[in-house]
Amino acid sequence: MSRGYKKTYKKIKRVQRETEYRRKGFPKRTLYLVLGIVGGAVAAAIIAGNLLVANKKEETNIETDSNIQMGGVSRIPYIDMLTEHDTIYNRLTGYASKNFSKDDIGYTYAYLPSDRRQKIYISVTPDKIEKLSFQVRDPDNGVLVEENQVTEISEAGGKTVAVITVKDLINSGHIYNMQIKLDLKDQPAGILYNTRIADTQGDQIDREIRYINEFTGKVFNENETEFISKATYATDSAESSNYAYADINSATSLIMWKGMSAQMQENPVPSVIHSDKDTVVLTQSYPVTYKGPGEKEERVIVNEAFTLEREGAKDEEEEETTSVLREGEYGPKLTSYERKAYETLDARDLSITKERFCMGLQADEKVQCMSSETGQYICFVNGGNLWRVCSGTGTEKGGFVRLFSFEGDDGVKTDITELVDVNDEGKIKNVRGRNGIRILEVTDDGDVTFAVYGAFPAGKHEGESGIGIYRYYTKDKKLKEAVFIKASKNLEGMRKLVNECYLNDYGELYITTDSQLKKINIKNYTLETMTRKAVNDISSHSEDNSKYAYATQDYGGAGLASEITVYDCDTGESRAIREGDEGIYLIGYMGGDLVYGVAGVDEIERNTGGTKVYLKKIVIADKDGNEVKFYEKDGEYFSDVYIENATVAFTCYGKNDGGGFVKKDTNRLVAREEGEGGGCSLRFDASDIRRRVLYMDFTKGANDSTGEDAYLLDEYEYMDGNTVEI
C-alpha cells in the first residue's frame, strides 16, 4: 500500500459503504459516510477536521453570550397553486433572498387557467404581506419574459388568496419558469418560490388530481380492498415483505397496511412534476400513524409517486357524480405506483437491546450515519432530527441524545417531506425535507460537529436561508454554533455547498461556489477567495474534500484542460499538473488520489452527435502528484470513463483503417483496497405485525439501555456577529 493511501484509509476507516456523485458530466467521487446509497436530498456525511483545536485553545473563539431555542413558530409560509376549478395542488416552499434569481428552476409543473389568471393560497394573512411579485423566464435562455407586482389580494380562512395574471407574452404549450417573491413586513429579505408553468389552452389537471385524492382516501380503508385491487395490479396473496415499500404489483395487504390500524394525519397536496398530452406524473407526501408493538401509536411519513395515462376522460359534469377509479373505463388510468415510507423515531422507543436498536419501518437503508473510530458513539439522521447514541461500553452511560431539531411551537414536524424526487420511469429516487443535516465528525470523546442547511424556520436565524456549523460537547452537554453562512440559494444549492465543504484543524471552512474555492475563517468570520474560477466548470473534490482540483487553462474544449491545479485545504498550498502538449481530462478523486486521463487533439472526435474524447492514458496520482498507477497500451484508447467503488471503469477502443474509433471491450483499473469497516451497520430483520423493520447494529459491542435514558437538547448557544454572507 502506498503512503498516499494510508492517510486516506485512516480517515475513512469508519466508512461502511460509498456512493458515487457525478457533477456536470464529470464523474466525481465524494465520500459519503452513509450506510446505503444517498441520492439527495437524502443526506450523507463529510469527513472534516476538528472544529476547534484544544491545544491551540481555539475553543474561546465560539464562547457564547446568548442561548436560543431551536424550535418556534415558523415564519416561512408555503404557497399552494389552484387549478381553474379551484383544486389545490403543487405546494411550494421558499427560501430567503433579497432579489429574484434567474438560475433557479421549479420542480413542480402548473397548468395556467384558460384566462391566465393563476390563483394561489399563501399560508399567512394579507396584513403580514408587504409586497407580492413574480417573474416569468424562458428556461432555454434565461430571458426575462415578464415581471410584475400582484395586486389582486384578499383573505379567506386565515390565508391570503392572490391572483397572478400572466400577460399574453408566452407561447402556447411552451414551458416557462415562474418565480414568486413574497416580501413580509417583519422580515428583511424576501422569500422566493419556484415552479414551472405552461399555457395549456384550457387543458387542466383536475381529473388526475381527483384520481389521486380518491385513491389516497381509500388506500388505508380495509373495506375498500376491491377498489384498490381494481385501481392497481394488486392481489390478495400473502406477502412477507417490508410494509414501508409498495408498488403497483404489491399485494393488497401490503398496499393497504392491513392489520396496522393506519390513520392519515393530514390530507396530502399532490404535486405535478411532469405532464404531456398522454401522461402525468404526480407525487405526494403525508404523515400516517399505525399501531405498533404494545398498541403504541407510531408516526410514519409516506411518500408516493403516481404515473397516469390521460385517456377516455368524460366531461366535468359527469365526473362530479361518478368515481374516476373504475378499471380505466374512463378518466385517468394508473400505470405506475410506488410508495416509500420512513418512520420517525420517538425518544421513548429508543433502546439498545442485544447490541442493536430498532429504527422501525424504513423503506430502505438510506440512513446517514457516522461512528467514532472506537465505535462507542454513533450519529444518525432521522425525520429531520440529528441523534447521537452511546454504546455504554466506555465511561459514559449508554443512551440517546437528540442533538438538533427544528420541531417547534407551531406543531409543524421536522420529518415532513417537501420534495419527492423521481426518475424517468416514475420511480422514487430520494425524498427531501425542508432542511438538511450533514454530519462532519464524531470524536472518540463523543463530541459531534455537523452542518444544518436550508431555510431556517425557527431559532436565531428564523426566516433566513443558509448553513450553520454546530458542535456538541459531551462534557457539558451543550450545543454551540460556530458560524452561520447566509446564502441566497435554494435547498439543492445549499446541499451542494455542504457536500463539498471542508473544515480543517485551524478553524478554516472551505466551500465551493461560483466555480471558485472560498475560505471562511470561523475565528474572525471573514470570507476570502482562494482560487481562480475553474475553466469550463471543470473541477473535482477529494473524498474528504481536503483537496480541490480545477482546470486553469483550456485545451480546445471537449472537457480537456492544458493545466489542472490542485489546492490543499490543510496547507493552503497549490501545485499544477501538466502533460506537455497533451490535454488533461479530469475524471475525479478516489480517496485522496486524483484520477485523470491524457489525450491530444487527434483523440477528440467531433460530429453532429457531439464531441467525444478518447484517452491515451489513465493516471492515478497521490496527494503529492506522484503517479502511483497508470494504464496505457499501444493502439488502445479509453472512453466512457467513470469511478466505481475502488476501481476506474472504462471502455477500450481501437482504430479502423479509416482512422475512426471502434469499440473493443470494457476494462477496469483496480486503484486501491477497501478501507476498514465502521462502528455500525444497518440490516433488515423480521418483526411481528410490521413484518420487517430496520436495525442499526453496534459492530464493536454495546450495553443495553432504555428510552428513559434519552436526552433531548432544545437550545443552542451562539455569539453575535458570527454570520458570513456569500
Predicted segments with their positions:
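Hydrophobic membrane-insertion alpha-helices, especially the h-region
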Residues: 33-50
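Solvent-exposed serine/threonine-rich low-complexity stretches and specific carbohydrate-binding patches
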Residues: 139-158, 402-406, 483-488
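Exposed beta-sheet edge and beta->alpha loop/turn motif
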Residues: 163, 168-171, 278-353
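Surface-exposed, charged secondary-structure patches
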Residues: 104-121, 130-138, 143-149, 155, ...
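Core segments of small alpha/beta cavity-forming domains
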Residues: 64-134, 179-183, 187-263, 357-416, ...
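N-terminal Lys/Arg-rich, disordered targeting/topogenic segments
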Residues: 1-30
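Short loop/turn segments that connect beta-strands within beta-propeller blades
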Residues: 392, 475, 521-525, 568-571, ...
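A short hydrophobic beta-strand element
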Residues: 273-288, 302, 448-452, 594-599, ...
